[in-house]
């Protein structure tokens, strides 16, 4: 496994599991299942999987979640490009911890904004990000269509079509660090 042992490691003990959040340095192929869980389009994943940096949540030696952070090279804005937690570990705060760690890293790099895009139909994920302090920024219509490489699906009966962009201001904001009230990834 390609987890960096030299990276800053944060450990949390929660619900009888000890989690470590670390920067991943291995082959992104090792994380294919998580990338597929985060995005319904294998073609889309292929275009961005190699970009940026990836944080992983580990329970022992097992990767249970990831967050891909893109942007850099002097840019003021970073983007959460991909975030997923194994289905059997969702709801335990793993996604929140990954976002908190990414936001902290962005603050240390003096970035002002953290962006994320998600499906407008996925109200559970929209709630998750808003509980962390992200705010609605804009809607990208027809981003998830067969023409853009996505299957025709519905989330909780809502057709998957539009992408919603959310932003989190990082200058002096601490919303991402506050305890979540449910809806955790």
Where are these regions (language model features)?
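Conserved active-site tyrosine of GNAT-family acetyltransferases
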Residues: 128-129, 134
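Short, P/G- and charge-enriched loop/turn segments at secondary-structure junctions
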Residues: 42-44, 150-157
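Conserved GNAT acetyl-CoA-binding A-motif
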Residues: 106-118
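Active-site acidic-Proline motif in GNAT/NAT acetyltransferases
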Residues: 86-88, 92, 120-121
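Acetyl-CoA-dependent GNAT
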Residues: 19-88, 96-100, 140, 169
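Conserved beta-strand-loop-alpha-helix junction that forms the acyl-donor binding cleft
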Residues: 116-126, 137, 141-147
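A conserved short alpha-helix in the GNAT/GCN5 acetyltransferase fold that borders
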Residues: 90, 99-107, 130
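Conserved N-terminal entry element of GNAT/NAT acetyltransferase domains
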Residues: 2-26, 164, 170-181, 185
């Amino acid at each position: 496994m390609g987890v960096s042992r030299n990276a800053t490691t944060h450990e949390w003990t929660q619900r009888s599991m000890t989690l470590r959040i670390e920067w991943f340095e291995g082959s992104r192929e090792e994380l294919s299942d998580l990338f597929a869980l985060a995005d319904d389009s294998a073609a889309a994943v292929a275009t961005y999987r190699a970009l940026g940096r990836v944080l992983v949540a580990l329970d022992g030696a097992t990767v249970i979640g990831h967050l891909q952070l893109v942007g850099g090279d002097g840019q003021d804005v970073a983007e959460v490009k991909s975030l997923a937690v194994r289905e059997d570990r969702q709801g335990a705060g793993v996604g929140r911890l990954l976002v908190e760690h990414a936001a902290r890293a962005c603050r240390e790099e003096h970035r002002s904004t953290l962006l994320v895009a998600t499906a407008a139909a996925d109200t559970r994920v929209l709630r998750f990000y808003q509980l962390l302090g992200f705010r609605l920024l804009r809607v990208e219509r027809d981003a998830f269509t067969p023409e853009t490489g996505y299957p025709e699906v519905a989330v909780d009966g809502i057709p998957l079509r539009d992408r919603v962009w959310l932003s989190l201001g990082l200058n002096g904001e601490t919303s991402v660090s506050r305890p979540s009230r449910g809806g955790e990834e």
